[in-house]
């Protein structure tokens, strides 16, 4: 995937940890090793088109290990960054971590990140606009303001599409970048792939296979 994206001039947002899978790690030493191993793989494969997201929604409920990943995010960011120097890479990838719909940025993450990562889930377009403007104007916030996930509704309808487009416009207008999350395609298992419909226009009454 990383190589295919690179050939198309695209960037991979690579998430190391999520609360739904962190139970596979036996202890915090295993978490540290995961950061080292994943980052070393990126370096060894010259994967320069990557943003490292140490943890996705590190502030929400559900994390195991007594929320160790959230509490030690600064150390994990620096651990990943140190691998580039240790390996004499001569280059480094941007590193950060995202919060959920709180759109909050924690000090111990902010002070060690290369960019500011938030989610707009279940927020109105105006709330997203306002928060993006606040972050963009704050000189303490690192790098780009990157809303890399936004859940504006879980059905493929015109109403949800309108909220998605309004959210994109709101974030863009205040200097942020916006990430579309097609919930039905990314959050369901097993993964389902539908061929394109006969028209690119979303219309009421379409079957699920056509609208998705």
Enumerate the language-model features and the residues they cover.
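An active-site-proximal structural segment forming one wall of the substrate-binding cleft
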Residues: 1-53, 76
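Extracellular glycoside hydrolase catalytic/binding regions
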Residues: 33-34, 39, 49-209
